Amino acid sequence: MGPKKQKRELPEDFDPVYPYDVPQLQINPPFVSGDGFNQSVDGVLSLHIAPPLVFDNTRALTLAFGGGLQLSGKQLVVATEGSGLTTNPDGKLVLKVKSPITLTAEGISLSLGPGLSNSETGLSLQVTAPLQFQGNALTLPLAAGLQNTDGGMGVKLGSGLTTDNSQAVTVQVGNGLQLNGEGQLTVPATAPLVSGSAGISFNYSSNDFVLDNDSLSLRPKAISVTPPLQSTEDTISLNYSNDFSVDNGALTLAPTFKPYTLWTGASPTANVILTNTTTPNGTFFLCLTRVGGLVLGSFALKSSIDLTSMTKKVNFIFDGAGRLQSDSTYKGRFGFRSNDSVIEPTAAGLSPAWLMPSTFIYPRNTSGSSLTSFVYINQTYVHVDIKVNTLSTNGYSLEFNFQNMSFSAPFSTSYGTFCYVPRRTTHRPRHGPFSLRERRHLFQLLQQ
């Protein structure tokens, strides 16, 4: 047996009588016009539209319009909400203008006032001299004596000119000049000077003075003087002894002697070695001055390194002529004083031996000849032992021993002082006690 055939389902409205299909009912209107309507092949009637008519989302017929148009009260009108636009009573779109812009039948124009002109290239400014255009900018060229500043145009002032409180230009007046009530520059004069139209003149008594070849001189006449004044030819002078001298036009009491001074200079550089190095790292100041039968000394030490608690020594070793030797720990200059400078003994024509310590009072190469002094470092007392002639067998020496030196660099000592008896020389013999003048001068040196 073959496969069993299934029964095909039939629609409920199936009519077994031929024809089997239900005929479609077509109903046509009694008339169709071709104006505005369109009928498709299948008989569908529709509207025939063209832009700007369109169907919206609800399939309703509407009008499509672009920018510049809007619906107002179910009417299509021109949108005038943009700046500078409006509609006239005729409903036409026009521009809104404001002075100096004007609107005419020909178009928009600009009302021009004085100083402006219009050309094919555009609006321009009318200028006349001295105004001019430079770099598309209006400028005012300036003549000599004028200048442009942030505050505006002003006067360029040269030397000797200024402005007063009223901003007027005036002359700067220095010493010896003045402006009179008429604004004229004059030279004030006080007696015996006289200022006139011819210039400055000198008012003098013709009885006492005479003008000869533009030079004013004292009229010669007999003048009697009494000592100590003296008259020689046309000059009156003071007669004084060798105990006085004239210094800068003043009579002063002159000492009968001039002290010798050997020193390191007022501001020496590093000149002593304080540690085990080959380069000086300390500065020592020493000044020796012979006054009569004594040598007065002052000294000070400055260090650029830290020092530990130990004795620091600075020595000066001299030969038999008083010249500083190279084996001294002091390595700087040491010579005679000339104002604030140091000069060599040969240049000064002086003998440094005259300031050397006496070998009779301070024997050579012994340890017993010493002096005592002291200095302060940061308010700390430091004892200084000064040994004399202890380092030389045929010359002289001074050795400064600073005790318990433990200070942080940099530091400077105060000035210490001492004195000793110098050797006797034939260069400057000295006998007997100090005179009154010498004692006064010695006191002045001790006060310095």
UniProtKB/Swiss-Prot annotation:
It comes from the Viruses. GO terms for cellular component: host cell nucleus; viral capsid. Gene3D superfamilies: 6.20.10.20, Adenovirus pIV-related, attachment domain, reovirus attachment protein sigma1, domain 1. Its main location: virion. Homotrimer. Interacts (via N-terminal tail region) with pentons. The keyword Glycosyltransferase does not apply. Induction: Expressed in the late phase of the viral replicative cycle. Keywords: Capsid protein, Host nucleus, Host-virus interaction, Late protein, Viral attachment to host adhesion receptor, Viral attachment to host cell, Virion, Virus entry into host cell. It comes from Porcine adenovirus A serotype 3. Belongs to the adenoviridae fiber family. It is found in: Virion; Host nucleus. This is Fiber protein. All late proteins expressed from the major late promoter are produced by alternative splicing and alternative polyadenylation of the same gene giving rise to non-overlapping ORFs. A leader sequence is present in the N-terminus of all these mRNAs and is recognized by the viral shutoff protein to provide expression although conventional translation via ribosome scanning from the cap has been shut off in the host cell.
